[in-house]
Each structure stands twice: as C-alpha cells, then as structure tokens.
C-alpha cells in the first residue's frame, strides 16, 4: 500500500497529488494533497501507531504537536504544519513549550511501549530508579553491538551511575529525539514538535540531545531552571544518542562517544 492508498482507505478521501519530502533517514514521509485542496502528511514507519500515541501525549500537555488524523499498521497520517523559520528563531518560545512538556510527569521512568530508531530498539520498560533505567535501557543495551574495549568502558560507567545521576529526578515527559530538525517554527514560535521518541525521565536528557546538534543561546539554557550540576551530567545523557548514531551510521561517531566518556572519567 502506498501513501495515497493508505490515506484514501483510512480517511475515505481521494488524494490528488503525492510528493515525497526530504530527510527521513529512518522512515519515508510524504505530503499529500486531497481532492478538496487540503494538505496532510503521511509517514511510513514500523512504529507508526506508537508514534501517534506520543504525538497525542505531547499535544495533551499544551506543547504543540501535529494533529493525528489516523494511524494504522505502518502509516501515520497527520496535519501538515506550515513553517517559515528554524529553531534559532524560536528559542524563547521553545523554552516555554519545554516547560509545558516536562511538567507532565509520571510515577516511574519509561514508557508503556517499546520504540525504535530503525534497527535500533529503544527499550522503555519502566523502572523505579533513574540510574538503573539509564544503565539498563540506555547504555548496557548497546554492549552486544560495541567493540570489547568500548563495551567494558560503558559497563564501568553504568556500574557507577549512582555517583553521577540523581536517584529520583522528576519523571518528566521527554520528547526523546529533540534536535532542531524536529522543531517546526512559524512566526518565530514553535509550530510543532515532531518525530518524537517519548518516555518519562530526567528533563536534562532533552537538553543534552538539543545541545548535541544545535547551539542554544545562554539565555535559553538559563531560562529552563535546570538543577545544579547539570552540565556535568550532559556527557552521560549524550551517550545515548551518540551510541545510537554509532550503530546506525558507523565509526564517524566513534570520536564523539570517546569524548563523552572521557568527560566523565571513563
């Protein structure tokens, strides 16, 4: 089933035009124009139904997310969001929206369902202890795919996480893959947060991802009101996306992993 066929079956509307959009390393994304002229986005991904639930969870906090029109099998249909800028135009509003997102908390860390970045499985089984969750679900899960030396260093860090991470930070709702490309901007405001990989955890995780690929200004970071010592925890939280990228895209990320490990003494 192609994108147009999926939309026609799920929405009962005829599709007049289909255009594949750029990006989408791990999934295919299309802009569809219906017979009446309305536009929508169709995303083809194995975790389409899970992503729909995440978008709805984000929207329920008051942070902007595309409206889910339908989700079934490998197809997610969403409203089309018009944009006219980039994340650098909307730092003040992004800080405000992250405040809304992260204010939604849960009793435990994790998420009701597993997720994935392409072939990399994201384990989300709930855990009552944050260092335990980060060790088992975000670091040790990579060991079978790493070199023996790198695996040993990751394992040593995992054993010492209680010395580096808070035991019970607020289990905030996280976007989970927060970088500038997943922040849609219009009129210098955040129009939508897209492509989530949600779970509940320390809100500093979203900051670590955002500062990995983007350069937020100082006022943005200060406005978040992060806990004392947050810069020292950032390398530990960056290891998760870096290890995922190492597995997905190869050794070009090895030096970044090394830098993060050395920053925390491993």
Task: Report each predicted region and the residues it spans.
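ATP-binding glycine-rich phosphate-binding loop
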Residues: 10-34
């Amino acid at each position: 089933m192609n994108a147009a066929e999926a939309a026609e079956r799920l929405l009962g509307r005829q599709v007049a035009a289909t255009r594949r959009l750029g990006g989408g390393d791990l999934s295919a994304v299309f802009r569809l124009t219906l017979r009446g002229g309305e536009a929508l986005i169709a995303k083809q991904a194995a975790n389409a139904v899970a992503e729909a639930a995440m978008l709805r969870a984000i929207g329920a906090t008051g942070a902007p997310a595309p409206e889910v029109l339908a989700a079934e099998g490998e197809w997610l249909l969403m409203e089309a969001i018009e944009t006219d800028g980039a994340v650098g135009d909307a730092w003040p509003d992004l800080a405000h929206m992250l405040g809304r997102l992260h204010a939604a908390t849960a009793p435990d860390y994790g998420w009701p369902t597993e997720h994935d970045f392409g072939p990399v499985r994201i384990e989300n089984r709930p855990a009552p202890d944050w260092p335990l969750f980060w060790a088992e679900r975000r670091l040790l899960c990579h060991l079978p795919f790493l070199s023996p030396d790198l695996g040993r260093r990751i394992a040593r860090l995992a054993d010492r996480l209680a010395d580096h991470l808070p035991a019970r930070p607020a289990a905030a709702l996280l976007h989970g893959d927060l970088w500038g490309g997943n922040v849609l901007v219009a009129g210098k405001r955040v129009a939508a947060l897209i492509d989530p990989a949600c779970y509940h955890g320390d809100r500093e995780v979203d900051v670590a991802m955002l500062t990995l690929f983007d350069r937020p200004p100082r006022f943005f970071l200060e406005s978040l009101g992060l806990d004392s010592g947050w810069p020292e925890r950032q390398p530990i939280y960056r290891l998760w996306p870096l290890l995922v990228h190492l597995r997905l895209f190869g050794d070009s990320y090895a030096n970044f992993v090394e830098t993060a490990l050395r920053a925390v003494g491993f």
